[in-house]
């Protein structure tokens, strides 16, 4: 099954920001496009707005003047649904209400031809439920674009329970012909991106609720150590706290209140107080005129130790040994058993967090980094009874490497490590339940939410057992089940261990 021919008209119903964006994508690809909105005059206003954006593309040399004029000629506002009768594809982008969408598609089914592909851009509703209102649900598919649709490349092509594979393939190939990167996925709450991404927000909010760190510090650690483009607090302020919380609540409810997707009470209170983020002028941060954004907590300068003893294999943090040497600090290697560690001159131990709490007074944990060489900030954590001077020694060591240091509360798994481990876990669970392929999950998370690595690529870098082991330890300290490793992750780690036993 191939993509729609460019001569085939495409209709977009709903002319808000997303509807306009989808219409622009189809228009620039070369299709005749019909715009329809239930509110009189909105389709014409949307056509004018799209025309203005085409003008800006010409100004930026991304579209020729002739291309703009041809595109404008192909864009037609429709006054009634009947004017969409000859369309080969109708994409719906109306309000996220099941009854409204079902009513619309029932009406469309009475208008369009039998071979017309019907698609919903829903981000939170069941594609199966929306399509269940149709007499012929086989031609119904989800086409989930990401906002802004003309700029973001990802499109999730969602097959409902009754979607004909040929319909899904045609939608997939059409999205690709439009210059997008489609990923195929089954109809599951949150599809790929909004399902696998929940821990990015949840673990940040959990650290805040546990008083381990404030929003500015969590955001800085996620950006400067984790390699994420934005922290969870600033990102949800950009998305809109009401929108983000609604998606989380929808996924949680759709999974029958699965504890892994439990919403944040702190975020709920933010929404209830109308602190919705940038659009309301205040969310986690204040965006009012003259407001100063708080900076992250950063440790005061401390002296570097003269040497460290490196025992065993530091695993994902092994690069630190070379960095310490390059900083002029002597490294004394020693053979060790079990997890690697750095022993400081005062006798204290510095370890990469493994999901345990640093209960010993002689132990400091440091957080995971995407790339320890490139990281500009490292989080440290110790018990409240840590031996005096040990945190200063650990801080001085990382400062000698050119890193800012944020000391956070003693939460198991800290910030980056716990977030990455949970994302990896949900990715394995999604693949095991037939939602998407590992390759498509990685593509979706990189392109849909700008993660520096896909979950499976991250798992390969960190080791097959890393996420399972860390989450198992976190679960021992927090036995609610939210961080318990999935069966899929257990199987993956167990298989890797079995291969190692066979090879040894």
Stretch-by-stretch model annotation:
Residues 2-4, 29-31, 180-183, 187, ...:
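NAD(P)-dependent Rossmann-like dehydrogenase/reductase catalytic/cofactor-binding core
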Residues 26:
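Aromatic pocket-lining residues of Rossmann-like dinucleotide-binding sites
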Residues 19-20:
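N-terminal Rossmann-fold NAD(P) dinucleotide-binding loop
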Residues 63-76, 138-139, 180, 361, ...:
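A short helix-to-beta-strand connector/capping loop
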Residues 15-16:
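Glycine-rich Rossmann-fold phosphate-binding loop(s) that bind the pyrophosphate
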Residues 42, 56-118, 125, 129, ...:
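Rossmann-like NAD(P)-binding element
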Residues 31, 36-63:
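Glycine-rich phosphate-binding loop and adjoining beta1-alpha1-beta2 segment
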Residues 103-154, 159-173, 342-391:
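Rossmann-fold NAD(P)-binding glycine/threonine-rich loop
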């Amino acid at each position: 099954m191939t993509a729609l021919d460019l001569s085939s008209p495409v209709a977009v119903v709903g002319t808000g920001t997303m509807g306009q964006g989808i219409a622009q994508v189809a228009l620039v690809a070369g299709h005749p496009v019909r715009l329809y909105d239930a509110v009189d005059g909105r389709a014409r206003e949307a056509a004018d707005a799209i025309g203005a954006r085409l003008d800006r593309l010409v100004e930026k040399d991304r579209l020729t003047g002739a291309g703009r004029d041809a595109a404008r000629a192909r864009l037609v506002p429709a006054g009634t649904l009947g004017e969409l009768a000859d369309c080969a594809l109708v994409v719906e982008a109306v309000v996220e209400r099941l009854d409204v969408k079902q009513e619309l598609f029932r009406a469309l089914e009475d208008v369009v031809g039998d071979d017309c592909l019907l698609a919903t851009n829903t981000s939170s509703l069941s594609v199966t439920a929306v399509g269940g209102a149709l007499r012929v649900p086989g031609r119904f598919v989800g086409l989930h674009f990401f906002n802004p649709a003309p700029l973001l490349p990802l499109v999730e092509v969602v097959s409902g329970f009754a979607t004909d594979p040929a319909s899904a393939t045609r939608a997939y190939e059409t999205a690709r012909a439009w210059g997008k990167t489609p990923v195929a996925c089954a109809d599951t709450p949150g599809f790929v991106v909004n399902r696998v991404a929940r821990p990015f927000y949840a673990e940040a909010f959990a650290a805040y609720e546990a008083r381990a760190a404030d929003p500015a510090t969590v955001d800085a650690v996620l950006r400067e150590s984790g390699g994420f483009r934005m922290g969870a607090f600033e990102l949800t302020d950009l998305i809109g706290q009401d929108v983000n919380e609604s998606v989380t609540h929808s996924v949680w409810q759709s999974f029958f209140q699965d504890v892994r997707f439990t919403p944040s009470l702190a975020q709920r209170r933010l929404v209830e107080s109308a602190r919705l983020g940038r659009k309301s002028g205040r969310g986690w941060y204040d965006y009012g005129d003259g407001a100063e954004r708080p900076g992250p907590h950063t440790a005061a300068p401390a002296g570097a130790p003269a040497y460290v003893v490196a025992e065993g294999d530091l695993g994902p943090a092994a690069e630190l040994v070379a960095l310490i040497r390059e900083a002029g600090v002597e490294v004394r290697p020693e053979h060790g058993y079990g997890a690697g560690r750095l022993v400081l001159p005062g006798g204290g131990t510095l370890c990469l967090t493994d999901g345990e709490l640093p209960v010993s007074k002689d132990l400091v944990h440091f957080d995971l980094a995407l790339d320890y060489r490139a990281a500009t900030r490292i989080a440290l954590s110790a018990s409240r009874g840590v031996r005096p001077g040990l945190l200063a020694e650990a801080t001085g060591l990382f400062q000698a490497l050119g890193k800012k240091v944020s000391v956070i509360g003693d939460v198991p798994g800290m910030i980056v490590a716990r977030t990455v481990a949970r994302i990896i876990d949900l990715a394995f669970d999604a693949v095991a339940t037939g939602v998407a392929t590992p390759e498509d999950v990685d593509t979706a998370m990189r392109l849909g939410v700008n993660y520096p690595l896909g979950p499976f690529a991250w798992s390969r870098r960190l080791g097959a057992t890393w996420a399972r082991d860390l989450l198992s330890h976190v679960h021992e300290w927090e036995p609610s089940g939210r961080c318990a490793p999935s069966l899929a992750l257990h199987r993956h780690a167990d298989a890797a261990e079995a291969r190692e036993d066979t090879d040894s």
